[in-house]
Amino acid sequence: MRWPSLFLSFMFWNALGLQGKEGVHWAFIAPQHHTPPVVKQADWPKNPIDRFILAELESANLKPSTEADKITLLRRVYLDLIGLPPTPGEVKAFLADQRPNAYEHIVERLLASPRYGERWGRHWLDAARYADSDGYSHDAPRVMWQYRDWVIRATNDDLPFDQFVVEQLAGDMLPNATAAQRIATGFHRNTQINSEGGVDREQFRIDSIFDRVATTGEVLFGLTFGCAQCHDHKYDPIKQVEYYRMF
């Protein structure tokens, strides 16, 4: 049952093994701590990240934009967190709220909204190739909504990312696995399904596994695993033999 964590560790250290070699991509170099730079407009930064941004602006003889007004700020946070604009009533209430932490209250309320998981869970669902239909020319409806809802609930419940990954890769293999943990493995079942006549079922089964391997590598490592299906990867640190260890 330790295989998900062992696999992730193996790939991580394999990538780190590239450090020190000529032409190593920055993505495989461990991040280092950097002291925030000194800036001229010292009263503008509100946090260390602002100092890095301001330093670049000053080096280009540019100035920060003016602070957004309350309505613009409210619209931005609504669209960012729940994907919907505020209602006229919500705008009116926010403009009337004179508390110094009124914006923070809005952020906390939106983070607690079920819409938050729907808005941000869709990014994972897109990467996991979720769809409500099978694809191909028939594109018949499929019953996968329970996996979709699991992702939304996990996002709203702030499920730790390591557990989020483990339950999708091997939720059915966990000790005393719950129904929800088994549903999470729907991650592997998001492959397109070809129900056309004349389909070679064994070939389709193998193609489905290729799809799962490629997707798992892409969403967890940001690497194009599919290239290693036919040969050692030309750019990313993946050998063909490593690809088929996941197959």
Residue spans of the language-model regions?
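Sec/Tat signal peptide C-region and signal peptidase I cleavage site
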Residues: 16-20
